[in-house]
Amino acid sequence: MVSLEEILTQTKNTEFNNQYKTNMPSRLRMATLYGIAALNGNARISCNGNFSERLAGYFTLWGDGAGDFAPLAHLFVDEVVQLGIDLGLPKDLCVKAPSDGMSGKTDEDNLGFTYDELKKVYLGNTEEIAEEKIVKIQNRIKEYKGAIIGACAHYG
């Protein structure tokens, strides 16, 4: 078996791409949170992603997309913002450009469309959206992260 130290030594001179640099901190954070939860007995981890992010596949598998429960999973981004305002959270926390906090770009910069446009396409309200953007959004919705993980057939 190869040790973690050997693997890291072999990759020392590797140029890590932006996707790796963006996703790895989220995965390490989640592994750390689950480690802390294990040390604290019955602790559970909350996945705080929302429906817009899930629909666009804009989350890190085994990172911010993981958790034991997901209280915001059925809310679009605008509904999460309104919930925060209704709960009295600081406005600067609730009303800001969505960002992964790691790439230096907004979600809209990375996706090429807004969450409002995503919601409109999903709900069929596309009158004000250019056809090429509608197609881009529909294709994004159909990508692999939106699919249910398949189970292997059991033979025997």
Task: Name the predicted role of every residue range.
Residues 1-4, 9-24, 34, 38-44, ...:
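ATP/NTP-dependent adenylation/nucleotidyl-transfer catalytic domains that generate, transfer
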Residues 26-29:
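Active-site glycine-rich loop that binds ribose-phosphate moieties when present
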